[in-house]
């Protein structure tokens, strides 16, 4: 999430949102190591190549993306990534999953996720997700983001 938020730094980088900061504090308080915006996952928007940088990678191979505002382009991007990388477990943490897709929409972020089989939560990562068994992540398909160091 873009913005001017820069409350604190980790791994030499400032968080870009208050929600990212809150989730990082949750992980730290539980003694869970994480990589912050380290991995760049390639995906293709038809006729053009793009890179997606998820916010967090947990030790068990689950990627976490935090979202306040979740616009149409973000939703399209997540569908493309899921189609092109079905082996990845990418979950969303919303400021509020009850927010509507757009003004006047009958559909909330959470309802949209349920329709598309995307796991999500509000405010913080559910502890059960952090304790799930390790999943294999095909790191050989990805590039690391320049200037960001791996944790641990």
From Swiss-Prot:
Its EC number is 3.1.21.2. Keywords: Endonuclease, Hydrolase, Nuclease. It catalyses: Endonucleolytic cleavage to 5'-phosphooligonucleotide end-products. It comes from the Viruses. Pfam families: Phage_endo_I. One of its GO terms (molecular function) is deoxyribonuclease IV (phage-T4-induced) activity. SUPFAM superfamilies: Restriction endonuclease-like. The keyword Nuclease applies. It is an enzyme of class 3 (hydrolase). One of its GO terms (biological process) is viral process. Endodeoxyribonuclease I, which is expressed in the late stage, is necessary for T3 genetic recombination and the breakdown of host DNA. In the early stage of infection, T3 DNA replicates as a linear monomer. In the late stage, the T3 DNA replicates via linear concatemers several genomes in length. The gene 3 product has also been implicated in the maturation of these concatemers. This is Endodeoxyribonuclease 1. The lineage of its organism: Viruses, Duplodnaviria, Heunggongvirae, Uroviricota, Caudoviricetes.
């Amino acid at each position: 999430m873009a913005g001017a938020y820069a409350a604190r730094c980790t791994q030499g980088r400032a968080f870009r949102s208050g929600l990212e900061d809150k989730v990082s504090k949750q992980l730290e308080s539980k003694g869970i190591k994480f990589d912050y915006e380290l991995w760049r996952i390639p995906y293709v928007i038809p006729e053009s190549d793009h890179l997606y940088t998820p916010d967090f990678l947990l030790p068990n191979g689950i990627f976490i993306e935090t979202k306040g505002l979740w616009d149409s382009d973000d939703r399209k991007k997540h569908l493309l990534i899921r189609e092109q990388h079905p082996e990845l477990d990418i979950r969303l943490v919303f400021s509020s999953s009850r927010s509507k897709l757009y003004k006047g929409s009958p559909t909330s972020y959470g309802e949209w996720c349920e329709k598309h089989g995307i796991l999500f939560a509000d405010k913080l990562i559910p502890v059960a997700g952090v304790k799930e068994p390790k999943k294999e992540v095909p790191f050989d398909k990805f590039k690391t983001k320049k200037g960001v160091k791996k944790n641990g």
